[in-house]
From Swiss-Prot:
Localization (cell): Membrane
Residue intervals on the Extracellular side: 64-523
Compositional bias of kind Basic and acidic residues: 757-769
Protein's name according to its UniProt entry: Discoidin, CUB and LCCL domain-containing protein 2
Transmembrane region(s): 524-544
Cytoplasmic side: 545-769
Keyword Cytoplasm: no
GO annotation, cellular component aspect: cell surface; plasma membrane
InterPro entries: CUB_dom (IPR000859), FA58C (IPR000421), Galactose-bd-like_sf (IPR008979), LCCL (IPR004043), LCCL_sf (IPR036609), Neuropilin_MCO_CoagFactor (IPR050633), Sperma_CUB_dom_sf (IPR035914)
Name of the gene: Dcbld2
Swiss-Prot/TrEMBL keywords: Disulfide bond, Glycoprotein, Membrane, Phosphoprotein, Signal, Transmembrane, Transmembrane helix
Provenance organism: Rattus norvegicus
Amino acid sequence: MASRAPLRAARSPQDPGGRAAPAATGRAPLPSAGWCPLPPGRNSSSRPRLLLLLLLLLPDAGAQKGDGCGHTVLGPESGTLTSINYPHTYPNSTVCKWEIRVKTGERIRIKFGDFDIEDSDYCHLNYLKIFNGIGVSRTEIGKYCGLGLQMNQSIESKGSEITVLFMSGIHASGRGFLASYSVIDKQDLITCLDTVSNFLEPEFSKYCPAGCLLPFAEISGTIPHGYRDSSPLCMAGIHAGVVSDVLGGQISVVISKGTPYYESSLANNVTSMVGYLSTSLFTFKTSGCYGTLGMESGVIADPQITASSVLEWTDHMGQENSWKPEKARLRKPGPPWAAFATDEHQWLQIDLNKEKKITGIVTTGSTLIEHNYYVSAYRVLYSDDGQKWTVYREPGAAQDKIFQGNKDYHKDVRNNFLPPIIARFIRVNPVQWQQKIAMKVELLGCQFTLKGRLPKLTQPPPPRNSNNLKNTTVHPKLGRAPKFTQALQPRSRNDLPLLPAQTTATPDVKNTTVTPSVTKDVALAAVLVPVLVMALTTLILILVCAWHWRNRKKKAEGTYDLPHWDRAGWWKGVKQLLPAKSVEHEETPVRYSNSEVSHLSPREVTTVLQADSAEYAQPLVGGIVGTLHQRSTFKPEEGKEASYADLDPYNAPVQEVYHAYAEPLPVTGPEYATPIVMDMSGHSTASVGLPSTSTFRTAGNQPPALVGTYNTLLSRTDSCSSGQAQYDTPKGGKPAAAPEELVYQVPQSTQEASGAGRDEKFDAFKETL
């Protein structure tokens, strides 16, 4: 019985109370309106008991029996059932019995979305009973009644069959009930009334039963923009095309922040109403196979669109009008395709060139306000070769699927195929229309590749004779009154759509929901693009980090006060340019300690030499008599010009063996190193060629005056000069040194100036000797 077709309860149009018409089985209808119930307390229960007795004695006429049945859809794996008039008050003295069967070996779970049955008589006349099994061998699971009863726990059967019995007697209120069922393995079953407010998770997956297209429920919103949080989940899923009303199915929901406005649309026979601001909305996760297949974009060429006939005429201005098949492109300006004839034999055909997975179709009317033409209902046929056609039916259905069309000439209406169609050719066969058959179409779907084999490519249909309706239409003659052309009838039976009165064979519907494999190019791009993006991002980060680290390293290396010179190598290079001296002089260099002046500003003190470096300024040699004196103990300052006038304090070293040209200053006085001055009394100043000003620097921009007396040179010197050199005591306001006195100066910063000056002065010194 798993292949049993879903059934819906039918209501008689003559019965305003909504009671079901008697089944066409030859049995008499149950007594209803002509019977008056007895007052309470006087055999008031005799009528319900009589109805129940008659119901049990009648032969089985289907899955439901009685006059108390409401909205009912009983599917092979799930379904929905309600009491009569739900959600309004159910009438007095009604009865309904539902017999539910699923696949052998399965069990059934029942869950109530709403339960409101009056319990004033302690479940004596108004109640709901559930039984294990069907028929006389059934056993009772439970008897239920109560207004606003919260039945949160589901009820499970012991076998694959259950019976649900609803009885109503005399009562004053009560909406009745709404229940849903499914096989036992659907652990996440929900009812048709559940909304997102019943769940706390931002994302979740639930199973919707069949039959959730409720006539009394309302939804707001559309896909992909989202649905208002007050919309029932399963009914919104039907509108979105992710679940079938006949079969039910799994839905995946994502909750997000609401929007101020929700638009209205018609899809899958569900009308979405306009909605306003809500705190949240929800959308559905889909397989992604809902893209357009090329009618609007032009991927489907004009020759791939054909029709049974074409509406052509000449207007009062003498202009020809032809609403050809290639005009049936959705959202393209201009007129639509329109058929010349107005019968159910007309069709619009689309060739996709190869098999594709078709998941939906969108239609609209003429889109012209002066031509209120549209198709309100249609069938869909499909084929692999364009010759043998199959009418689309829902799984397990015995009748062709009639799709809800448009209700006006300009709004879009969407219908989804569940399960999808796998075919190359699609035909739309209108069965109802407004004035004339006119429509624009777009197909939804994606590429189809069955795992394990290549896509099936079919050859185009062979050319037919001139009477083929798809290829030939009679064009009107020019200059005559408006004239309509009628296509000739086809000779081949395969070209003619099925008449409504004809009996059709069971279609070979490809009931498969296999997700198509993505083509190699798409899969390769999906993998390479993220990898390339990540690789480029990583490379950029590495380059930025390396550049930043290098800048920091350079900055750290540039914070030294003075560079460190190799004393030994520099000293040996200088000695080669000077006359030989005694070893004693070379082994007694003067060193000055580095006072912690590096923490002072450049204007306060000058930069001092490092404590472990004995670096001396080269002497300036003039035309003097005697041997070359020991070089000056002053070190040139890097990065500063000779005119910089900051003081450079030095700590005088205390040594037992004094340098030949320097003596320590008294402890009480300022400690300044002074230049070594040679006695020039016996020589001409013109031969020296050096200025007589001192190169000592003072605080300020003016050069200091040289004053003081000269001390005699020590006996360790190599010079025999008659003059005596003395240390100068720094005192302000003294006159400058005499021009005849030779002073040592700080060498120039550039190598060229120092080298040239040294050569010239050394030559002058040799000439003097």
